[in-house]
Amino acid sequence: MSTRPAFATAMKTILLDVGGTFIKCSDGREIPIDSDGSREDIANSLKEALADAQKAAVAIPGPFDYEHGIFLMKHKFAAVYGECFAEIIGGNREYRFIHDVNAMLLGEMASGAGKAYERVALVTLGTGLGFSMSLEGHLLMNELGSPLVPVYTLPFGDGILEDYVSKRGFLRGYQGLTVKELAQRAGEGDRAALERFADRGTILASCIAPILKEYGIQCLLFGGQISRSYFLMAKTVEEGLRNVDSLQYAGPVQDIGNATFNGLKTLL
């Protein structure tokens, strides 16, 4: 974790959760952003989100150089690849940057479901598949500040794990349906929908169990929008992790909507 000094609290600060289509702001605003857009479009959205704040703590997906604030993504924000966040925006603000999955994990360790544990892992289920771990209060990160052990690229089936356990994985074979709607079908007893959630739980557990065992994880949390339907896959997840002797708890984060902001607050 960064040892840089915390922000001075006298200056106006904003917390930003930057996604591929929206920027969620700690003041309640949601600013549209097109991660496939032009440099100008991306800059304008970021400027609107920052408004008149003098300091900002920013959660953003990787690859990204979190120490220096440099975009390194090619699949998103390609128009600003290699550029510095602060230079794109201009002005004289101060920034702290953190991987979005790391931010959520920090939030849950500070004031959520992970608070009582020393070895915590987080899986985020949404458009993509995220994974982060913390041991004794320290995030496990690579040299750029991204989670040390990415699981989305783990080989599985005819592709990678993210192909199966993410939005596109849950909706394989379904046209014009959202994961929320699929969950509603499952809640109404639709057998195929129930099996889809159960299968995704089995797949995920089988792939991450060796990692959880290796690091002695005690608490496994689930975040992201799909985790709102965790109860539909809880049984198969727990069955698949029954041989992880260190594991004491598995379940959704305490505050899906605010966990990332809670993590960003710890940077201030």
Question: What are the roles of these predicted feature ranges?
Answer:
Residues L264-L268:
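Short, hydrophobic alpha-helical segments
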Residues T21, P61-F64, G126-G130, I226-S227:
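Short glycine-rich anion-binding loops that position phosphate/pyrophosphate groups of nucleotides
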Residues R4-N44, I70-L72, L139-L161:
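Short glycine-rich, Thr/Ser-proximal phosphate-binding strand/loop in the N-terminal lobe
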Residues S26-D27, R39, R96, S111-D199, ...:
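Glycine/GP-enriched mid-protein hinge/lid loop-to-helix segment characteristic of carbohydrate kinases
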Residues I31-Q54, L171-L232, Y249-T260:
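Adenine-nucleotide phosphate-binding core of ATP-dependent small-molecule kinases
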Residues V18-G19, H99-V101, L125:
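Fold-independent oxyanion-binding glycine-rich loops
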Residues S35, R39-N44, K55-A56, G62-R119, ...:
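Glycine-rich phosphate-binding loop and adjoining helix at the ATP-binding site
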Residues T13-D17, K55-A57, R119-T124, G130, ...:
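Short glycine-aspartate micro-motif
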